[in-house]
């Protein structure tokens, strides 16, 4: 059973799953807001942040210094990443069999139709335009987290690591 939060209008679910969340965001202010929104939403599980696309790829592909980092169940990805674009991060994750199951919520400052098409063509799970209003931004992040954290069934890290089929292994530090 769920109720609705009076402050945000987002459903309050009593059955939020423990999930690992990775936030890829180059703007420190947006990182802070995203983390605050996830905490407000009742994040259970781990939360990791990286500040740019190359670092995100090292993290998700478990390269040093992230060789022992947990595989996330959900990724919030900013499109405007320096050096390695958010679209490239999305492409790499969604083309790696052991990682393609991870839902990726892509955020951008505009709704450019070409960007939106590119995100979905690369199998992004959700595209949201970052709203200008703080309360709206927090509501979007909370809503996404509640959806992925309580409504849907996610592939778990344990299932991925247990006995993956040939070619489905999560890359290790020497990959």
Residue spans of the language-model regions?
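Alpha4 helix (beta4-alpha4-beta5 surface) of REC/receiver domains from two-component response regulators
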Residues: 35-36, 88, 110-128, 132, ...
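Residue-level signal for the "D+5" position in two-component response regulator receiver
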Residues: 49, 81-84
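Acidic catalytic/metal-coordinating carboxylates
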Residues: 52, 85-88
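Negatively charged, flexible loop motifs adjacent to catalytic sites
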Residues: 27-30, 82, 98, 110-114
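Active-site residues of response regulator receiver
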Residues: 77-79, 108
């Amino acid at each position: 059973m769920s109720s609705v939060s009076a402050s945000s209008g987002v459903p309050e679910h009593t059955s939020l799953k423990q999930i690992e969340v990775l936030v890829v965001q180059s703007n420190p202010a947006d990182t802070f807001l995203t983390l605050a929104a996830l905490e407000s939403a009742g994040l259970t599980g781990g939360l990791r942040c990286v500040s740019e696309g190359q670092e995100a790829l090292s993290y998700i592909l478990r390269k040093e210094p992230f060789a022992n980092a947990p595989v996330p169940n959900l990724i919030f990805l900013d499109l405007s990443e320096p050096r390695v674009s958010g679209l490239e991060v999305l492409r790499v994750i969604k083309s790696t069999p052991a990682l393609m199951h991870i839902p990726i919520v892509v955020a951008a400052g505009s709704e450019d139709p070409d960007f939106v098409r590119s995100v979905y063509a690369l199998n992004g799970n959700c595209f949201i335009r970052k709203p200008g209003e703080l309360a709206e931004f927090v509501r979007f992040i909370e809503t996404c987290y509640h959806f992925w954290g309580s409504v849907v069934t996610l592939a778990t890290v344990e299932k991925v690591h247990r006995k993956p089929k040939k070619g489905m292994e999560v890359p290790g530090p020497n990959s």
